[in-house]
C-alpha cells in the first residue's frame, strides 16, 4: 500500500512538472514511458497534453493561411512589396480558399501603391504611338538648333568621291553629319549606294536636296512634287525602304508654293545660320577663311552650318578644323534631327509621301520689279527673268571671277543663275549669266 501511494505521488509530481514546462530535458520522456501503467493516473495521462501541444505547430505549418498572413503584415509596408506579390500569386500552389483569402488581404494592403502604378502604366501604353510624334514643324524654314550645346554641320550636293572619307572623319571624332543629297548632281547616287547605306546605318542623317538640284521656285506644284518623290524612290532602294522627312531647298530659293508643297508633303525645311562658303574658298589657302566664317557664326549664336562634301579641300582640310572648334567650345556635333530634339524615328518615313489632290500644274508667274534686259547670248533654264545686266562666259572664267568683276556676291550669282550650281560646275562657255537685277 505504501509503495502504491508513493508511486501515485511520484506520478502526480511528474505530471505537474510536465504541465508547467520541462525543468530538465529528460522529463517529457519520463512521463511518456510505457512502464508507468495508465491506471496509476487518476486523471488523463500527462503525455496526451504534451502530444497536443507538440502537434499544434505541425498543424499550423500545413495551414498556409497562418504563415501567409504573417508575411502580409511585413510586406504591407509601402516600400517593398511591388515585385513579390505578382510572383507569389502566380504560383500554382496558392489554390486553397485560405490562400486565396490571404492573397486578397495582401493585395488590398498594397492597393494604394499598385493601383496607381497600374493605371499609370496602362494609360501610358495606351497613349503611346507606334512612332514618336514630331514637334518640328513642316513647311517652315528652320535655320538654327533648339537643343542647347549642339551644332549641326551639314553637307549639300553629294554624294561624291569624298563623302566616304567625310564619314571616316566624323566617325573618328564621335560626331554625326547630315547629308542633303541629290540623286543626280556631281554624280549618280546609285554609284555611291554603299556610302549612303553606311551613313544611314551608322547614325548620320540622310536628307533630301531634290532629285537633281532644281530651282524649286521656278517649278509648278507637280514639278516640285516630282523633284521630291523621285529622289525618295531612289533613296528607298538604297536604305531598305526609308525615305527622308528633312529637306533643304537648293539655292535657298523659296516661294510660297514651295513651302506650301513641303508642308503638304510633310517635309521639314532646313536652311542654315552659318555659311562656311567653302565653295568660294576651295583651295588650301582658303580653308582658314572658311574656318573664320564658322567661328564668327558660332560667336553670333549660330548652330546649323553649311558646307559641301563635293569639294576635296573641304573634306581633306576643313572638316577636322571645324570639329576641333566644336570640341574646343564644349559643344557637340550632331545631326539636324538631334539638334532639334527630334527622335531618329522621325527622320524617315517608310511609305511614299501622300501627294495632295488638286496640285497645281501651272508654272508660277514671275513678278519682276522691272522688265529684264534681253540677254546677249543663250541662257540656261531658271535664269532671273528681271535681269538687267549680263555676262557672256568666255574661256577661263570662274564664278568667283565673274562675281568679283561685277561687284556681286557669289550667293546672288547662284541665285540669279540656279542652273550653274553652287559649285559652278555648269558654267557653260558662250552662255550669258545674269550679274545684276
Swiss-Prot record:
One of its GO terms (biological process) is carbohydrate metabolic process. The record marks 278 as: Raises pKa of active site His. Its main location: secreted. It catalyses: peptidoglycan-N-acetyl-D-glucosamine + H2O = peptidoglycan-D-glucosamine + acetate. The keyword Glycoprotein applies. The active site is at residues 156, 308. Zn(2+) binds at residues 157, 209, 213. GO terms for molecular function: hydrolase activity, acting on carbon-nitrogen (but not peptide) bonds; metal ion binding. Transmembrane segments: none annotated. Residues 350-370 have a biased composition (Low complexity). It is found in: Secreted. Residues 149-334 form the NodB homology domain. Its cofactor is Zn(2+); Co(2+). CDD domains: CE4_ClCDA_like, LysM. Keywords: Carbohydrate metabolism, Cobalt, Glycoprotein, Hydrolase, Metal-binding, Secreted, Signal, Zinc. Catalyzes the deacetylation of N-acetylglucosamine (GlcNAc) residues in peptidoglycan. This is Probable peptidoglycan-N-acetylglucosamine deacetylase ARB_03699.
Amino acid at each position: 500500500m505504501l509503495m502504491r501511494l508513493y508511486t501515485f505521488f511520484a506520478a502526480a509530481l511528474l505530471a505537474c512538472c510536465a504541465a508547467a514546462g520541462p525543468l530538465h530535458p529528460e522529463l517529457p520522456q519520463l512521463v511518456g514511458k510505457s512502464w508507468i501503467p495508465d491506471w496509476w493516473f487518476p486523471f488523463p495521462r500527462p503525455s496526451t497534453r504534451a502530444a497536443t501541444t507538440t502537434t499544434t505547430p505541425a498543424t499550423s505549418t500545413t495551414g498556409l493561411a497562418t504563415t501567409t498572413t504573417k508575411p502580409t503584415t511585413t510586406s504591407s509596408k509601402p516600400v517593398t512589396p511591388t515585385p513579390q506579390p505578382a510572383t507569389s500569386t502566380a504560383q500554382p500552389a496558392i489554390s486553397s480558399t485560405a490562400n486565396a483569402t490571404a492573397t486578397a488581404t495582401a493585395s488590398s494592403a498594397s492597393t494604394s501603391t499598385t493601383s496607381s502604378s497600374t493605371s499609370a502604366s496602362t494609360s501610358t501604353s495606351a497613349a503611346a504611338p507606334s512612332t514618336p510624334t514630331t514637334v518640328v514643324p513642316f513647311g517652315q524654314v528652320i535655320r538654327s538648333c533648339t537643343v542647347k550645346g549642339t551644332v549641326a554641320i551639314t553637307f549639300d550636293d553629294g554624294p561624291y568621291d569624298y563623302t566616304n572619307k567625310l564619314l571616316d572623319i566624323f566617325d573618328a571624332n564621335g560626331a554625326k553629319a547630315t547629308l542633303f543629297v541629290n540623286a543626280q548632281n556631281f554624280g549618280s547616287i546609285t554609284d555611291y549606294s554603299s556610302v549612303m547605306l553606311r551613313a544611314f546605318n551608322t547614325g548620320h542623317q540622310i536628307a533630301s536636296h531634290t532629285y537633281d538640284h532644281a530651282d524649286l521656285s521656278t517649278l509648278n506644284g507637280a514639278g516640285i512634287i516630282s523633284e521630291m518623290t523621285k529622289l525618295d524612290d531612289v533613296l528607298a532602294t538604297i536604305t531598305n525602304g526609308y525615305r527622308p522627312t528633312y529637306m533643304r531647298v537648293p539655292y535657298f530659293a523659296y516661294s510660297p508654293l514651295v513651302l506650301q508643297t513641303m508642308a503638304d508633303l510633310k517635309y521639314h525645311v532646313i536652311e542654315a545660320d552659318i555659311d562656311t562658303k567653302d565653295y568660294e574658298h576651295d583651295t588650301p589657302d582658303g580653308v582658314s577663311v572658311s574656318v573664320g566664317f564658322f567661328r564668327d557664326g558660332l560667336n553670333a549664336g549660330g548652330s546649323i552650318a553649311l558646307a559641301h562634301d563635293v569639294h576635296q579641300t573641304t573634306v581633306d582640310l576643313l572638316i577636322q578644323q571645324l570639329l576641333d572648334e566644336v570640341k574646343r567650345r564644349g559643344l557637340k556635333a550632331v545631326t539636324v534631327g538631334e539638334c532639334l530634339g527630334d527622335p531618329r524615328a522621325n527622320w524617315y518615313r517608310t511609305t511614299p509621301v501622300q501627294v495632295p489632290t488638286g496640285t497645281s500644274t501651272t508654272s508660277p508667274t514671275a513678278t519682276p520689279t522691272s522688265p529684264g534686259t534681253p540677254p546677249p547670248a543663250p541662257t540656261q533654264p531658271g535664269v532671273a527673268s528681271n535681269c538687267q545686266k549680263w555676262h557672256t562666259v568666255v574661256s577661263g572664267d570662274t564664278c568667283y571671277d565673274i562675281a568679283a568683276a561685277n561687284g556681286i556676291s557669289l550667293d546672288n550669282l547662284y541665285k540669279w543663275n540656279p542652273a550653274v550650281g553652287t559649285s559652278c560646275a555648269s558654267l557653260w562657255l558662250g552662255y550669258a549669266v545674269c550679274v545684276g537685277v
